[in-house]
Amino acid sequence: RLVLMNPNSFKAKYNLDARTNSEVIRINRAKKTITVRNVLTNEEYTESYDKLVLSPGAAPIVPNVNGTTLEHVFTVRNVVDIERLQKAIVEKDAQNIAVIGGGYIGVEVAENLRLAGRNVTLVQSAPQILRPFDFSMAQILQKEMMDQGIHVVVGDGLAGITTESVILASGKQIKADIVVLAIGVRPETKLVEEAGLEIGTTGGIKVNQNYVTSDPHIYAVGDVIEVYHRLLHKPVRLALAGPAQRQARAVADHIYGIANQNKGVIGSTSIQVFNYAAAATGLTEEAARNAGFQVDSVYVIAPDKVGLMPSSNPLHFKLVYELPTGRILGAQAIGKGNADKRVDVIATLITMGGTIEDLKDLELSYSPMYSTAKDVVNMAALVANNVMAGRFRQVHVSAVRDLVESGAYFVDVREENEFANGHIKGAVNIPLSQLRERMSEIPKDKPVYVHCRSAQRSYNAVMALQGSGWDNVVNVSGSFLGICLYEYFTDVQTGREPIVTAYNFK
């Protein structure tokens, strides 16, 4: 079924013969024909081609566990699937729904079901939802889903489904009137395999830079193919709409003799999770390390627009870069404002081989209603530049718990009233406004970890201390707000002892 267009409008506007309810069941490469079956009448007929373009997409993955064929279990691939799911929920008056899978589809399905007033559990076998984001950034979105009433389960996979519940690998059972499988997708390659076309190492159709398959008369685009990743320098599968539409344009160009070779993908994505916009591009820090890159990252929390504006909100921004070159490898942004704009800037730089040096002086448009004079992307580059040059040292929020539990020395340079509303256990409060008079209280014989709310005041404190002879001071990236966001979800889910006296997300 067509959604945005119909066969009549295709014919009237573009002179295209669009055939719905029609399935291609065979490709005869020798004769350059396809066999088509009308799914309503079962009639079969043959069409010939000069060039054939394949875009069968990808099918939902159904795990090999008991219960996946039960009538209350659904997958989501298209509008028809959504309508079937919606009808079943209404007819059963289903109140408890389990969504299996924490990727984009799973998160979006869970959110919409929760907004419809259902009790929703999201189950993800990996340690986090939304793998295009690093673990530290995903914690912000997991907290948001939890705050909105979704029961988020991570690190526990699906073991089976009964008529009343889902059974997890841990043995836990979750009541479920409806189960939605959103574990991922696999390329629909049955037809092309039967036709003898080459399948790549990733399981997608192998194509060249012009999306030509192993048959020079057959092209393939979309979720069914593997694509070249320009940072990893290897084929990957990337089921995204943006690359798919560019592939379609490139195929049309090539058929008509227009040179337009594919240069590869970097994987730029975005999603809304309730009140937050989230976007990512390139490699996560984890993916970059796993690929063999020597990398570092900076995490900056800055206003998305001038702080005096009533709609100003914190924007969480992570920048991943290669050492020692400073080449930018990836970025992630999460906030209530325009996260996608910031990530699009980084995507452009990655595509052009840009570095931290390029980004720190990049001239971007500015208005108090939309940004700050020094945008968060510039700020992140300045921080990275300072770290690379050795002007100060930083520690990431992921390392703070171990430091606290080992008795490390923390100095909190927020004001006394901020400190009273929540702080790292054992931290010493020396407000930045009092620092120069109280420097003698800070030891020189062991590492001192300095933090504030978002790492800006603590950076100033670190530089002041270094200028006064302290060479043992380290800035906590993300500082107290970042620590609270990083720790909160796992603290609540596992019941472990918090490392803060109280969480403060303001």
Language-model segments: residues:
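Beta1-alpha1 glycine-rich phosphate/pyrophosphate-binding loop at the start
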Residues: R1-E23, I61, A110-F133, S268, ...
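Short hydrophobic core segments
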Residues: S48-G57, A176-G184, A248, G326
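Glycine-rich dinucleotide-binding loop and its adjacent helix/turn
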Residues: L54-A116, H151, T201, V207-Q209, ...
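Mid-to-C-terminal Rossmann-like scaffold of FAD/NAD(P)H-dependent oxidoreductases
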Residues: V224-G337, P368, T372, V376-D402, ...
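A Rossmann-like FAD-binding core segment of flavoenzymes
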Residues: R19-L40, E47, L115-Q209, T501-F505
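FAD-site-proximal beta/loop scaffold in flavoenzymes
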Residues: T69-D93, E164-I167, K172-A250, V345, ...
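Rhodanese-like catalytic fold shared by cysteine-dependent sulfurtransferases
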Residues: E357-P368, T372-A399, L403-Y409, E416-Y449, ...
